[in-house]
Amino acid sequence: YPAYVLFPQCSESGYWAYAERPSVFQSKKMLADFPISPIFAVLKELLDSYLALPQVDKSRIYIIGLSMGAMGVYDLTVRYPEIFAAAIPICGIVNPKRLKAAKDVKFRIFHGSEDNIVPPSGSRRAYKALKKAGAEVQYIEFPGVGHTSWHQAFNVPDFMKWLFFQKKE
């Protein structure tokens, strides 16, 4: 699959979607309205510089993240739904009240049923909220798998095929 890939890594002292690490990972207790974090503001500038390149297909912009990165996936798709054709949050969490804004982004959500760091109930609620908003969304839960469900997610046979099939309408 030919593509331009941005693969940012958050610093040890930073946190993607929030100015600081949330004190609790319960979807209903996650913030619903907050300013963009400084680290995400810089990342958005970098993304915009790539989007300005004529060779980048603006109808095929995808975002994938795991754990804290999945929280970032939710945050950026809510803030900038016009950019993304598809999103894959893996073992993430979000306040479901935020997701209506991302209804035009196609989602494939992954989580392990035994995740004791970020509870799968957050992904289940995100799935239900996106479905209710009219989004095209799939939820795949891996039975018996803990927080490292990205191993199983990346090994789903049609992972890349599904992603690269998505196009912004």
Residue ranges: model-predicted function:
Residues 1-3, 102-107:
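Short, proline-enriched alpha-helix->beta-strand connector loops that line the catalytic pocket
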Residues 1-40:
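Active-site machinery of serine-nucleophile hydrolases
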Residues 8-9, 64, 90-91, 142-143:
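Alpha/beta-hydrolase-fold catalytic nucleophile elbow
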Residues 11, 67, 113:
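Residue-level signal for short, function-critical loop segments
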Residues 16-21, 75-76, 99-102, 119-123, ...:
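Short, solvent-exposed loop/turn and secondary-structure capping segments
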Residues 39-46, 69-72, 76, 80, ...:
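Stable alpha-helical elements in mature extracytoplasmic
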Residues 48-103:
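Primarily recognizes the serine-hydrolase "nucleophile elbow" in alpha/beta-hydrolase
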Residues 106-169:
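C-terminal catalytic histidine-bearing segment of alpha/beta-hydrolase fold enzymes
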